[in-house]
């Protein structure tokens, strides 16, 4: 049974172990999970995951694996062996890649992390997609990739809250993980397709990834408590 009682995932977007753990020590594992991304993982490797788990946190390993099917599946297997709660892959890697990842987790006898697909990054708008040869709205590409993820048997998707309602309608069994969440009054930063925590949950999101509004707050514990109160 999960120790965390909320849908909040706090992004530990730091370059060093000490900085990440300084924030983690101010947070309550009952009120949030934590996300380890590329910068922190590249700096600290698997040790940071073990340390966070020892502190009671469930860990979302946000490395967005994208490679040939076997290589990606072996990376997902390695993540599972670390004991992470959630791991993600890019849906644009295709059906065979995602299926291979799901199958390697099914072969495990122990706990299995949630396998989540990344659709379109929340920083991308139509002009960004056009730059890589896709002259369509982000939501159209999200729905295309979501259908592939569903077919491959993934547990859920990373998506903008603005796509959550359409995705829940089309794929109600998929769990939706939403970055780009900004509590009312927060700076937008480099996220483009964003909503507040309450708006995101109402739209169909299951988990909310929140970074700078908590990590850069003068009092991160209070900032987290404020978000918990907002969505209560």
From Swiss-Prot:
Matches recorded under Gene3D superfamilies: Aldolase class I (3.20.20.70)
Entry keyword set: Decarboxylase, Lyase, Pyrimidine biosynthesis
Binding locations of substrate: 13, 35, 62-71, 122, 182, 191, 211-212
Stored PROSITE patterns: OMPDECASE (PS00156)
Annotated catalytic residues: 64 (proton donor)
Pathway: Pyrimidine metabolism; UMP biosynthesis via de novo pathway; UMP from orotate: step 2/2
EC code: 4.1.1.23
Reaction catalyzed: orotidine 5'-phosphate + H(+) = UMP + CO2
GO biological process per UniProt: 'de novo' pyrimidine nucleobase biosynthetic process; 'de novo' UMP biosynthetic process
UniProt cross-references to SMART domains, sorted A to Z: OMPdecase
Keyword Lyase (UniProt): yes
GO molecular function annotation: orotidine-5'-phosphate decarboxylase activity
GO cellular component: cytosol
PANTHER family: OROTIDINE 5'-PHOSPHATE DECARBOXYLASE
Job description of the protein: Catalyzes the decarboxylation of orotidine 5'-monophosphate (OMP) to uridine 5'-monophosphate (UMP).
Protein name: Orotidine 5'-phosphate decarboxylase
Top-level taxonomy: Bacteria, Pseudomonadati, Pseudomonadota, Gammaproteobacteria, Pseudomonadales
Name of encoding gene: pyrF
């Amino acid at each position: 049974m999960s120790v965390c009682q909320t849908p909040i995932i706090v992004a530990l977007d730091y370059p060093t172990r000490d900085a990440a753990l300084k924030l983690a020590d101010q947070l309550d594992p009952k009120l949030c999970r934590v996300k380890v991304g590329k910068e922190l993982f590249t700096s600290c490797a698997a040790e940071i995951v073990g340390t966070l788990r020892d502190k009671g946190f469930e860990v979302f390993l946000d490395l967005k694996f994208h490679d040939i099917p076997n290589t990606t599946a072996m990376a997902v297997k390695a993540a599972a062996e670390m004991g992470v709660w959630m791991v993600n892959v890019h849906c644009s890697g295709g059906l065979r890649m995602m299926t291979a990842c799901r199958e390697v987790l099914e072969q495990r006898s122990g706990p299995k992390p949630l396998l989540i697909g990344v659709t379109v990054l929340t920083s991308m708008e139509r002009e960004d997609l056009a730059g890589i040869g896709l002259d369509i709205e982000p939501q159209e590409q999200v729905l295309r990739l979501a259908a592939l993820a569903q077919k491959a048997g993934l547990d859920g998707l990373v998506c903008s809250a603005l796509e959550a309602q359409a995705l829940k309608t089309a794929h109600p069994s998929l769990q939706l993980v939403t970055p780009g969440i900004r509590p009312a009054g927060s700076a937008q930063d480099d996220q483009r397709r964003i909503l507040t925590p309450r708006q995101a949950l109402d739209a169909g999101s299951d988990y909310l990834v929140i970074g700078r509004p908590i990590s850069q707050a003068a009092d991160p514990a209070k900032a987290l408590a404020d978000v918990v109160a907002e969505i209560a």
